[in-house]
């Protein structure tokens, strides 16, 4: 019996060893060979199906696209960039990316040609990347098909990412690019479900955070490398997650116009976080959409160019038709044109607590029919033109700027034109401001033929201190000037202002246009040089003023 049990034990051991050997053979047999076709494996259901992902890329940040049923492609909400079964198209800020993720350890060979879909445009830059290593790249300027080289027998591990990237060359117009690669894979079977997320996708950033940090999208402070792509990616991700963008302390480099659309961007403080624009002709931070905010940071141009045509692309900040926007606690240092330009019908905005200096044009300029804007508690020094201005043009503005409040600002200090100016506009309130040391009038209310501006109506100027303005010769502006060379200025009221130390004269009302009702109530005029008042035009109403 004992002998029989011993024999059975040997048999069992033999069977166990055999199973082990069979298992080893089975593992070796699990190696597979499979071809992954970009076009045949294209999915309209889920990212990662058949190992394929559809993304956009800015800098080092990959972001998932969303499937667009109408176009039968994966696309950004704006429509670009996009990736279809057979083609890709980038946009100005993002590359278009088709990505394959290796299911296991093995070797791949990539085949299939790439070509522009149109002879128009300035071309595209196409590349193949293994994780962050570029395997191949080519610039395509015509529709000739090109076959990538050096992409055979490439070793991969489970999770290795192979990215097919289409980047604009200069402009993204006509950048439709035909590219449907095949990947022949030999290796471990791994997972065929393929729904695992792209490990390099910025969606892997900490979603539990209440903010989106630009650092999570590749930005690095205090170096000379361009952070623009990382900022674009962070803003895009923040909008999709409905979170603000946070920019930690340090200096960040921006090579182009940064557009913020419906997102809050906040720094660590206007003396801690700095955004440095390196292109003096395209350095504006543009605010668009609804609820956009910019706060707690400094924006500076590395160099500036001449004001020239005054292009908005050269402003420090441009508000382009935004609604319910805020610009708070921002330090603007240098710009080729305006510091903060609010235009294209922007509405319901607050510009508060900012410091602006050495701008090429106006410090803060409101135009283009913008309305319901409050500008308060700002400091403006050494503006290249007016410190704060409301301007309405007949030729280019659909309506006059209206319902603007300008209060509690401290402005002037060597600014090269007027202090606070209304040159066309209605329902404007100017109150509790300190205005000093400007080349032209401290307060200027006017309609100008030279710029074909609109009429002025219902402007109230109250409780301001206007001190030693109108410095420039031979202009010899008074501290306060109401002027019309065309159109109508009407219903302008000055209440309880202190107007003192005018460089050449105190108050002036004149011009060849129509000036109607101008009222002065309880103002104090302290003046020693030239005429105290020059009322050459209009229906002037005086009530309890001193020094007139």
Task: Give residue ranges: language-model regions.
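Sec-dependent N-terminal signal peptides of Gram-positive bacterial secreted proteins and lipoproteins
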Residues: 2-25
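Gly-Asp-aromatic-enriched flexible segments
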Residues: 31-190
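Extracellular beta-strand-rich solenoid/capping regions of secreted or surface-exposed proteins
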Residues: 102, 232-237, 252-266, 273-296, ...
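Solenoid scaffold repeats with emphasis on beta-solenoid/beta-helix
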Residues: 108, 212, 245, 252, ...
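Acidic Gly/Asp/Thr-rich repetitive segments characteristic of extracellular carbohydrate-active
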Residues: 214-248
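Short glycine/acidic-rich loop motifs that flank beta-strands on beta-rich extracellular proteins
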Residues: 243, 254-258, 270, 274-283, ...
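Right-handed parallel beta-helix
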Residues: 293-394, 398-401
């Amino acid at each position: 019996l004992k002998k029989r049990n011993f024999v059975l034990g040997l048999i069992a051991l033999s069977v166990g060893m055999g199973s082990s050997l069979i298992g080893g053979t089975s593992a070796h047999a699990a190696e597979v060979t499979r071809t992954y076709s970009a076009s045949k494996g294209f999915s309209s259901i889920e990212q990662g199906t058949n190992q394929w992902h559809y993304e956009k890329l800015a800098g080092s940040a990959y972001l998932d696209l969303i499937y667009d049923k109408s176009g039968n492609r994966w696309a950004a909400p704006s429509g670009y960039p996009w990736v279809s079964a057979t083609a890709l198209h980038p946009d100005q800020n993002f590359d278009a990316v088709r990505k394959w993720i290796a299911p296991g350890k093995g070797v791949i060979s990539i085949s299939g040609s790439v070509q522009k879909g149109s002879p128009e445009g300035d071309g595209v830059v196409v590349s193949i990347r293994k994780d962050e290593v570029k395997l191949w790249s080519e610039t395509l300027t015509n529709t000739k098909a090109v076959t990538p080289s050096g992409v055979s027998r490439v070793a991969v591990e489970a999770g290795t990412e192979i990215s097919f990237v289409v980047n604009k060359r200069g402009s993204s117009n006509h950048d439709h690019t035909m590219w449907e690669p095949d990947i022949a894979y030999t290796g471990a079977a791994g997972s065929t479900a393929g729904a695992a997320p792209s490990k390099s996708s910025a969606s892997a950033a900490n979603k539990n955070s209440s903010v989106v940090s630009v650092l999570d999208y590749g930005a690095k402070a205090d170096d000379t490398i361009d952070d623009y792509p990382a900022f674009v990616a962070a803003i895009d991700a923040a909008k999709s997650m409905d979170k603000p963008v946070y920019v930690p302390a340090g200096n960040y480099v921006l090579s182009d116009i940064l557009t913020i659309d419906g997102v809050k961007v906040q720094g660590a403080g206007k003396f801690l976080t700095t955004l440095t624009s390196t292109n003096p002709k395209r350095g504006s931070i543009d605010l668009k959409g609804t609820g956009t905010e910019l706060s707690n940071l400094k924006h500076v141009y590395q160099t500036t160019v001449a004001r020239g045509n005054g292009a908005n692309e050269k402003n420090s900040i441009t508000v382009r038709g935004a609604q319910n926007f805020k610009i708070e606690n921002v330090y603007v240092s240098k710009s080729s044109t305006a510091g903060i330009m609010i235009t294209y019908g922007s509405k319901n905005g607050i510009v508060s607590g900012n410091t602006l200096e050495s701008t090429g044009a106006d410090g803060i300029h409101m135009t283009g029919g913008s309305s319901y804007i409050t500008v308060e508690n700002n400091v403006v020094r050494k503006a290249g033109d007016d410190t704060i201005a409301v301007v309405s043009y007949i030729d280019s503005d659909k309506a006059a700027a209206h319902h603007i409040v300008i209060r509690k600002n401290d402005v002037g200090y060597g600014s090269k034109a007027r202090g606070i100016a209304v040159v066309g506009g209605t329902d404007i309130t100017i109150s509790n401001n300190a205005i000093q040391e400007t080349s032209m009038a401290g307060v200027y209310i006017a309609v100008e033929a030279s710029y074909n501006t609109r009429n002025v109506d219902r402007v109230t100027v109250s409780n301001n201190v206007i001190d030693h303005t109108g410095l420039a010769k031979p202009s010899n502006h008074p501290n306060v000037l109401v002027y019309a060379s065309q159109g109508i200025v009407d219903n302008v009221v000055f209440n309880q202002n202190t107007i003192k130390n005018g460089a050449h004269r105190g108050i002036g009302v004149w011009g060849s246009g129509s000036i109607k009702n101008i009222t002065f109530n309880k103002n104090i005029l302290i003046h020693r040089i030239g005429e105290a008042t020059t009322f050459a035009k209009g229906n002037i109403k005086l009530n309890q003023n001193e020094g007139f």
